Amino acid sequence: MTNSSSSASPTPATSSSPSGSDRLGLTLKLLGWAVLGLLPLYAWTVSTAPIDSVQGMMQKILYVHPPLAYGAYLGFVATAIAGGLFLWQGREVHDQLAIAGAEVGTLFCTLMLITGPIWARGAWGPGNWWVWDARLTLTLLLWFVYLAYMLLRSFTEGDERAARFSSIYGILGVVLIPLNYWIIDLVGGAMHPDNLEFEEESSSLGVGMGLPFFVGNLTLFFVFIYLLVLRWRVGMLRTEAERAEFDSRRN
């Protein structure tokens, strides 16, 4: 993960105060307990879910793949919102949240790009590892966009102008998310069902498949929030340490 922060903040006492990182620490503990409670339930519901008569065991990736997509989208939206707040207020806490959103979102997007082809190959045969489906292609583009964001932050650490440029970049990049959602309805897809079809299939899963699908979404949502807050807190603690070191040298 990148180790980047902007060099200046108009309100350092507010944006990087120890009490702020302490609150994030408490939130992190609560989220950790929630994740620990949900993971066994998630594993149990997936393992006991009925096996699909057509796709077999590969169908169980349904309980992982869509939740990963939602996590990726949430991460990139968090980057855009936090970037907008940073441009408005110039506070380090928002810049660190933007970085955290991009990194965790890219992690989820990477796992989504891995699980999707595995599912396709298992369901439709060896020739379907990768098909240039419209949504799949846009997802790959989305991955490259936020990978570039992280590389930019890595190579421009401590540059406030780069932080502001990255904020604008993150806001523009998030436009790909609604496009990614609607692209199947606009041009169709070779692998993904259209949105109405997916919603109808999801609502008609029944208890056997519907419960693990719901628990999977809930669990990976909490995993996403946990990782987001963890990375956010690490960034804030690093910023506080750097500021304290700078103050000690100045004094």
How would you name each of these model-derived features?
Residues 2-251:
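Polytopic transmembrane helical bundles with strong interfacial aromatic enrichment
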